[in-house]
Amino acid sequence: MTLELTPIPCLTDNYAWLWHDTATDTVVVVDVPEAAPVLKVLTDRRWQLHHILITHHHADHIAGVEALAQATGAKVAGAAADAHRLPPLDHPVAPGDVLHLGMEAAQVIAADGHTLGHIAWYLPGAGLLFSGDSLMSWGCGRLFEGTPAQMFDTLTRLAALPPETRVCSGHEYTAANGRFALSLEPGNGRLHDRMDRVTALRLAGEPSLPVTLGEERATNPFLRADDAALRAALGLPGDAAPLAVFTAARARKDRF
């Protein structure tokens, strides 16, 4: 692999995801909650930023985009369907599009649910998924604009990617999401094992991300809608449809 990945903490619990393609010296960032922390890393490493990718319109993901673009000359890419709510786009994209960024081919995947017009960026060569606030570490984004069915479709689509894919979501929410998962299944040893690892990372000042998609499939309640143990934990009948299980889990999380 020729790609260096750096999660940059921003605001209270956000991440900007910076990557450097060492083969071509191409530098890309996904989401910019604020410009200053990203500029500091670029300056410290003497890197020139070339591209800014946006997942969705919420201010805690785009507030620093224009300042960073002006400071670096980087080109901005985001969903054409959401352009009216985004900073000016040099590259309006749609699901199914591919942007060639250095040696990487970044695929655009529809990720509606948290917001409408949300997209995810998938790098099959590097095995990286930048999911914004759709699929999150040990959770999923709250449904501000979309429906449970839309988010369920998004998660099903993302979960079909290779299990070794590393998920880079927009927030350091892993521990909080894990507490919810454990509230549903307090006897699940795999959940406790993951919480132990997350706790150790955070105590060491390290990010809990990225995480493999395989780990998410095994422990994230929102990716386990066909799991009998989760249905039982939610008090649902054994023949409950996966969408009903997901909807019940999301409603429970909203009240947690």
From Swiss-Prot:
This protein's UniProt keywords: Hydrolase, Metal-binding, Zinc
Catalysed conversion reaction: an S-(2-hydroxyacyl)glutathione + H2O = a 2-hydroxy carboxylate + glutathione + H(+)
Pathway(s) it belongs to: Secondary metabolite metabolism; methylglyoxal degradation; (R)-lactate from methylglyoxal: step 2/2
Cofactor note: Binds 2 Zn(2+) ions per subunit.
Tagged with keyword Zinc: yes
CDD domains per UniProt: hydroxyacylglutathione_hydrolase_MBL-fold
Binding site for Zn(2+) 1: H56, H58, H114, D133
Cofactor: Zn(2+)
InterPro entries per the UniProt record, alphabetical: Clx_II_MBL (IPR035680), Glyoxalase_II_hydrolase (IPR050110), HAGH_C (IPR032282), Hydroxyacylglutathione_Hdrlase (IPR017782), Metallo-B-lactamas (IPR001279), RibonucZ/Hydroxyglut_hydro (IPR036866)
A biological-process GO annotation: methylglyoxal catabolic process to D-lactate via S-lactoyl-glutathione
EC number per UniProt: 3.1.2.6
Name of the top EC class for this enzyme: hydrolase
Quaternary context: Monomer.
Matching PANTHER family: HYDROXYACYLGLUTATHIONE HYDROLASE, HYDROXYACYLGLUTATHIONE HYDROLASE GLOB
Family: Belongs to the metallo-beta-lactamase superfamily. Glyoxalase II family.
Protein name per its UniProtKB record: Hydroxyacylglutathione hydrolase
Native species: Rhodobacter capsulatus
